[in-house]
């Protein structure tokens, strides 16, 4: 398929701007960087709650680091596989994907996501990646009705889970609860896919694919995770595979750094959970360079810790390879980036360390639970009387959705998922706390 079809935008543009020689993907990057949805990431939880410390990452700084790692991966692959330089294309494209990858995630991290998914359980569900797709293509007001109106290839690259929610959902897998406070995230995992409300955009993105490619690309299978009841997609595009690797590396390495600096992960935990696996790795570089890196990671000398972090990132970035799946005709689907097996295992060990000692830490879970309750409380309030409680512009969207017979509950999810942690907390106080002040300070943000 020619590259021009992947540079097409859903809504034709005739912008004649003076001396503007930017490529289509440079324009995409600019639209993402200058969007309100991207700015809001500065006040959304990454792993550690916003306000706990002024050192750790927010979703904004995480996204910037993912972008840097993503372009580093592309540069390495370009040198390692010169025959694939045309496929790698524009660095601006990969920057766009990495900068935008978390743009749809709601306030309070996973707690907010599970809460919205539960409140939307009869209305198509909620999932952060699906919301990212929706913001880029419909909600962000760069255009009247086409969101940021990004290139088709950019939209293909943001598709981490290329199948509709209804195709992936397995009914009867959720226990009913009688009280919101009893909601367990493990029992209500979001379906990882595109909302059915956005099927028109999904179809447009996949339009250039052959019938066989589309069928295979959107195929689903049972999940390999024992506690995940829904079906899962199997494939992603080449650009998406690079973005996802960059995200995984940033999560495993940089979120680990935050936890080390804040004293949440200790040297003894590293020696117990990570060092043995690295020392027995089948890769000699991992055995020699990473097995003893814990000394630097937990050093009180900041420059030694930063050197260790750099070594980890470099090790993973340079261990990425390109795989060929000839069952696909379209090169953007045929080729995918992945980590060499021993490095994939090492990265997984780091991710499990973060999950075990950071994500599952009771103090972190209490913050997540609190955010979960805030989001459900807000949704319940707005759903009870949308034309009374929603801000005026959101009321108008809700009314239009009702009049056109669309899913008006999706408008509520759009509004709440766009909030920052702080704004959602303040709005909750305004609605439910007798001691809260007036709504004046909230009005400008609505």
UniProtKB/Swiss-Prot annotation:
Tagged with keyword Hydrolase: yes
Annotated HD domain residues: 59-252
Membrane-spanning ranges: none
SUPFAM superfamilies per the UniProt record, alphabetical: HD-domain/PDEase-like
The UniProt entry, under SMART domains, shows:
HDc (SM00471)
Q: Has UniProt tagged this entry with the keyword Transmembrane? A: no
Composition-biased stretches, type Basic and acidic residues, lie in 7-28
Give the molecular function GO annotations: dGTPase activity
Q: Write down the Pfam families for this protein, in alphabetical order.
A: HD, HD_assoc
Superkingdom as given in the UniProt entry: Bacteria
What InterPro entries does the record tag this protein with?
Answer: dGTPase, dGTPase-like, dNTPase_2, HD/PDEase_dom, HD_domain, PHydrolase_assoc_dom
Q: Which UniProt keywords apply?
A: Hydrolase
Which residue intervals make up region (Disordered)? Answer: 1-28
Q: What biological process terms from GO does the record include?
A: dGTP catabolic process
Which PROSITE patterns does the annotation name? HD (PS51831)
Q: Cross-referenced HAMAP family, in alphabetical order?
A: dGTPase_type2
Q: Which family does it belong to?
A: Belongs to the dGTPase family. Type 2 subfamily.
Q: What is this protein called?
A: Deoxyguanosinetriphosphate triphosphohydrolase-like protein
């Amino acid at each position: 398929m020619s590259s021009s079809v992947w540079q097409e935008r859903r809504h034709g543009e005739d912008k004649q701007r003076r001396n503007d020689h930017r490529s289509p993907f440079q324009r995409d990057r600019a639209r993402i960087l200058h969007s309100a949805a991207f700015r809001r990431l500065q006040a959304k939880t990454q792993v550690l709650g916003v306000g706990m410390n002024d050192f750790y990452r927010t979703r904004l700084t995480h996204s910037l680091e993912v972008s840097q790692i993503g372009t580093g991966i592309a540069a390495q692959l370009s040198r390692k596989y010169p025959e694939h330089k045309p496929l790698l294309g524009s660095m601006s494209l990969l920057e766009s994907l990495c900068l935008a990858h978390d743009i749809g995630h709601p306030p309070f991290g996973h707690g907010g996501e599970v809460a919205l998914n539960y409140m939307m359980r009869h209305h198509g569900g909620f999932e952060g990646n699906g919301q990212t797709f929706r913001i880029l293509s419909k909600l962000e007001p760069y255009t009247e009705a086409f969101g940021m109106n990004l290139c088709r290839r950019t939209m293909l690259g943001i598709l981490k889970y290329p199948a509709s929610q209804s195709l992936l959902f397995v009914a009867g897998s959720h226990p009913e609860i009688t009280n919101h406070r009893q909601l367990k995230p493990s029992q209500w995992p979001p379906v990882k896919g595109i909302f059915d409300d956005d099927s028109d955009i999904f179809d447009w993105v996949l339009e250039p694919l052959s019938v066989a490619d589309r069928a295979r690309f959107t195929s689903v299978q049972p999940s390999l995770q024992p506690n995940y009841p829904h079906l899962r997609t199997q494939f992603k595009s080449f650009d998406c595979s690079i973005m996802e690797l960059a995200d995984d590396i940033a999560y495993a390495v940089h979120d680990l750094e935050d936890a080390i600096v804040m004293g949440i992960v200790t040297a003894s935990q590293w020696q117990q959970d990570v060092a043995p696996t690295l020392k027995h790795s089948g890769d000699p570089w991992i055995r020699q360079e990473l097995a003893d890196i814990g000394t630097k990671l937990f050093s009180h000398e900041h420059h030694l810790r930063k050197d260790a972090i750099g070594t980890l990132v470099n090790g993973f970035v340079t261990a990425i390879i390109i795989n060929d799946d000839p069952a696909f005709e379209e090169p953007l689907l045929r080729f995918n980036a992945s980590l060499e097996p021993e490095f994939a295992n090492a990265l997984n060990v780091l991710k499990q360390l973060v999950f075990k000692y950071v994500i599952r830490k009771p103090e972190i879970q209490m913050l997540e639970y609190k955010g979960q309750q805030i989001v459900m409380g807000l949704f319940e309030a707005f759903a009870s009387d949308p034309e009374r409680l929603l801000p005026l512009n959101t009321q108008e969207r809700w009314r239009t959705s009702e009049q056109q017979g669309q899913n008006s509950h999706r408008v509520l999810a759009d509004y709440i998922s766009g909030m920052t942690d702080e704004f959602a907390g303040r709005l909750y106080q305004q609605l439910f706390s007798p001691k809260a002040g007036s709504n004046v300070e909230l009005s400008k943000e609505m």
